């Protein structure tokens, strides 16, 4: 997205025409099985953000590697250092499915209807400005569940039972309307997908996240 973090459209899912061009140039078509590889404990869950966005664009056969890049290396799978050269292809996206997307406008309008979950680090939640946010803090009343709490010490997802208990112990129920956010909608996309996997169906990733909210909304510390 053009501009900088915190701008009105920065961090949002691209419009269908833009996304068609982006994915088409990479040869990522809907008839392929797509495997996404990222980092878990050492990253922000970029693979989940891509999965979340591809699903919204109508891609159905998309998977992530549990444990990420480290798990693949530890398994002994063959890797290479040379960059791949994708072959461009035609991609058609009729519309974006916004059923698991939260917008700034909706959150401002109906804030009290949602339970808000901040998945950033302790430092960020408590007010540290680490990534050029307009101000520090967290959304008013936000429940704090760290993104890294989704994983065991080796970087693999915890069991559904462990995760569900963690969410419920934090004050969430499967009937709640839940909004996840982080700095730029990446870690929160991972958390939204995991919550959905655990049966929390009414979950929404706030893709603009704190970068935008710090510009337009109130925060607590």
What are the roles of these predicted feature ranges?
Residues 1-2, 40-44, 69-71, 121-125, ...:
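Solvent-exposed loop/turn segments at secondary-structure junctions
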Residues 3-34, 147-178, 220:
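Helix-loop module immediately N-terminal to the HCX5R catalytic loop
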Residues 10-101, 105-106, 187-203, 208-209:
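Thiolate-centered catalytic microenvironments shared by cysteine-dependent enzyme domains
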Residues 27-30, 47, 109-111, 135-138, ...:
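Extracellular/periplasmic catalytic domains that process cell-envelope and extracellular macromolecules
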Residues 30-33, 60, 112-115, 140, ...:
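Loop/turn elements at helix/coil->beta-strand transitions in domains of secreted/extracellular proteins
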Residues 54, 118, 142, 195, ...:
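Terminal peptide-recognition signature
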Residues 70-136, 140, 218-221:
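Active-site neighborhoods of enzymes that stabilize oxyanions during catalysis
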Residues 165, 175-221:
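C-terminal soluble interaction/assembly domains
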């Amino acid at each position: 997205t053009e501009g900088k973090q915190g701008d009105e459209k920065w961090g949002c899912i691209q419009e269908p025409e833009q996304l068609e061009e982006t994915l088409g140039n990479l040869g990522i078509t809907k008839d392929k099985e797509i495997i996404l590889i990222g980092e878990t404990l050492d990253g922000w869950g970029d693979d989940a953000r891509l999965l979340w966005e591809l699903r919204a664009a109508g891609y159905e056969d998309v998977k992530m590697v549990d444990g990420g890049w480290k798990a693949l290396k530890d398994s002994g799978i063959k890797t290479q250092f040379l960059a791949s050269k994708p072959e461009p292809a035609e991609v058609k996206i009729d519309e974006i499915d916004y059923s698991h997307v939260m917008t700034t406008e909706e959150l401002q309008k109906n804030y009290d209807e949602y339970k808000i979950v901040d998945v950033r680090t302790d430092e960020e939640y408590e007010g540290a400005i680490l990534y050029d946010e307009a101000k520090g803090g967290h959304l008013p009343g936000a429940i704090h569940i760290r993104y890294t709490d989704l994983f065991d010490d080796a970087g693999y997802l915890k069991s559904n039972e462990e995760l569900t208990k963690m969410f419920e112990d934090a004050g969430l129920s499967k009937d709640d309307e839940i909004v996840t956010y982080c700095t730029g909608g990446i870690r929160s996309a991972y958390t939204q997908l995991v919550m959905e996997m655990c049966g929390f169906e009414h979950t929404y990733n706030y893709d603009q996240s704190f970068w935008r909210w710090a510009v337009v909304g109130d925060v607590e510390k």
